[in-house]
């Protein structure tokens, strides 16, 4: 495995949005952008996922580029994994969506392997992240990094971009696996309120629909 790496993103100039949203709204946008820039001055926002391609990666590329264009130190890190790790996380991914996938287990052996892969990123994460930064973890592949991210002194947000409106045995299996990792997160983000599991009912939750209709 190559370890955690940073994805290079070209900033998007904020001025390009004026033609899209119009002059008055762009003025409001600029004021909000300036306030946001000042709020995050001297801090970095670290987005972490496990793949550089696909739907979440497409979203991250746009968000990171926009943040950089606003003068906010916005970063994107990708962790690496072996075939066993991706087999386990693909199984979790399917179960969160209510489908058993390959029907394989999510037991102690799978948990040990999952933790060994995400745990290999602890030292590098601690080198990069400073207290006061913000760490945003994306999807089940990075859920196991919550504790090590909090060790840096940074607030940690976990975003789950998948889900299903009606829970079943498969979703229960997935959340039994994931809940111990995300229980201590500072906030969670879901696309729909129906996707929030009962195990996270007391956690600060933000509902943020996907920016693209293709992802809904």
Annotate each language-model stretch with its function.
Residues 1-216:
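Catalytic cores of nucleotide-sugar-dependent glycosyltransferases that transfer UDP/GDP/TDP-activated
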